[in-house]
Swiss-Prot record:
CDD domains xref list: MPP_ApaH
Organism: Alkalilimnicola ehrlichii (strain ATCC BAA-1101 / DSM 17681 / MLHE-1)
Keywords: Hydrolase
A molecular function GO annotation: bis(5'-nucleosyl)-tetraphosphatase (symmetrical) activity
Keyword match Cytoplasm: no
Known catalytic reactions: P(1),P(4)-bis(5'-adenosyl) tetraphosphate + H2O = 2 ADP + 2 H(+)
Designated name of the protein: Bis(5'-nucleosyl)-tetraphosphatase, symmetrical
Its job: Hydrolyzes diadenosine 5',5'''-P1,P4-tetraphosphate to yield ADP.
EC number(s) per entry: 3.6.1.41
InterPro entries: ApaH, Calcineurin-like_PHP_ApaH, Metallo-depent_PP-like
EC top class, as a word: hydrolase
Family of the protein in this entry: Belongs to the Ap4A hydrolase family.
Length: 279
């Protein structure tokens, strides 16, 4: 059995099919971890959801910011943006079924035997991996309950940007959501900055990639390697205890798979056509 983590798809099905063919993926034998952002901006969001859902137990998915944005538009608490392609899901005959399936996906996923912990954007420096898993389950429980509509009414916003165990209600859940699905940069103390999305080296003074601060602030190395996506301008990055695998498939980069069951870190990438031009 082979186990792979695959980077952000954002509605790009043909590169996924080509990559899985290259990997000789067999759903009866192998397993895929999708790092999130299955949908939006690309041409085939609804077909991607159908494809991944049909994989059943052969696939596991963590939710990304574009996945949650789709759910918020469906809930009527957000508007689609100009370049969004979420309406193909909303208008599909099986759209409701796909959207309910999507909201039952994970915020984090771990396998101690394989030695990996998956999340869309990253793990804030102030949390251990065990704490991160617990925080993820808090938000998962709300998304899977009748309170999911109320959550989407309160999801958007950049505050609070600092974790406090005393946070409650929507503030607490918003921080958890932002940390797992939107985080790129933090300050030296781990405070979130959700405005800057450029490549490392071009950020304002006083901001650092979250994984650099995590490496510095954590008293001991993480017991599992974090695998994340979300940050296409970062690209493939192996730093300390994190492997980032969003390599910009949507923008004409590549779609990347990281093999998780191998003693050596094997990375396989497939070039992608540009489905959308960068700004």
């Amino acid at each position: 059995m082979a186990v792979y983590a695959i980077g952000d798809l954002q509605g790009c099905l043909s590169p996924l099919e080509a990559l899985l063919e290259q990997l000789r993926f067999d759903p009866a034998r192998d397993r895929i971890w999708f790092v999130g952002d299955l949908v939006n901006r690309g041409p085939d969001s609804v077909r991607v959801l159908r494809y991944v859902r049909a994989l059943g137990e052969a696939a596991v998915t963590t939710l990304g910011n574009h996945d949650l944005h789709l759910l918020a538009v469906w809930a009527g608490t957000a508007r689609a943006k100009r370049k969004d392609t979420v309406h193909q899901v909303l208008d599909a005959p099986d759209g409701e079924e796909l959207l309910h399936w999507l909201r039952f996906q994970h915020l984090t996923w771990r396998d101690d035997d394989l030695g990996y912990f998956m999340v869309h954007a990253g793990v804030p420096p102030v949390w251990s991996l065990d704490e991160a898993e617990t925080r993820g389950r808090e938000l998962e429980a709300v998304l899977r309950s009748e309170d999911y509509l109320a959550f989407f009414e309160n999801m958007y916003g950049n505050q609070p940007d600092r974790w406090d165990e005393g946070l409650t209600g929507w503030d607490r859940l918003r921080y958890i959501c932002n940390a797992f699905t939107r985080m790129r940069y933090v300050d030296a103390d781990g405070r979130l900055d959700l405005r800057c999305n450029s490549a490392p080296g071009s950020q304002p003074d006083g901001l650092y990639p979250w994984y650099e601060v995590r490496e510095r602030l954590r008293p001991e190395p993480d017991p599992l390697t974090i695998v994340s996506g979300h940050w296409s301008t970062l690209g493939l990055c192996q730093r300390g205890g994190n492997v980032a695998i969003d390599t910009g498939c949507l923008w004409g980069g590549s779609l990347t798979a990281l093999r998780l069951d191998s003693d050596e870190r094997e990375i396989i990438s497939r070039p992608c056509p540009a489905f959308l031009e960068p700004k």
